[in-house]
Amino acid sequence: MASPRRRLLRGLGWAGAILLGIAVVVAAWIVLPILTSSPAGSSGQPLDVEGFPLSVTATGDDGRERTLWAVLSNRESRDLSELVAGDRIVVSGSGYDPTTGIYVAVCKVPAALDQRPGPCLGGVPGTEEDGDINEGAIEFAASNWVNDDWAWRLFGARSFDDRQTGAFTAYIEIPSSADENVDCSQERCGLYTRNDHTALENRVQDLYLPVGFAE
């Protein structure tokens, strides 16, 4: 008969093996979409957008019609052409692909459609951030991350409002017009959606609203 100590060690060994198996499954769940991601074309929005519209609509190469719009909550008589640090913008979208996460942030407009928008003011959310955002919670930040995958929500991603319509809501607090990454008082910038790190080179969800900053 096995001694109590041996039974304990055997039980700990089984527990360790189970935990290792779970860790491998979770890691595969996270890494597989990144490894299998491939470019899916353009969002259909041209780089040159006239004026400072509060909404844009474009049909991507994937056949989805996406709409992006913004409401400046304290706009008074201003619009997106005269932003100041601390402005709060409620950003909404529809028609997005809910199987791929997106970042929402103020980023430099790229020189070509096949280039990634950025750098972005304040950077983009990182996977080192902890905390599931409660459904319906309003938390303003320089950038938001929207991803329905439960694993990424553990790192602070928001969920889509409606997967069927590809609808989301993000809450952006405008940072200073310049940081160590980009100076939006000198460069063309926009309030962007773009695919998150699970599909970084896929440009099909790159939509933006041009922004400017008050002098």
Label every PLM stretch briefly:
Residues 2-215:
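Extracytoplasmic/secretory-pathway segments with low complexity and glycosylation-like composition
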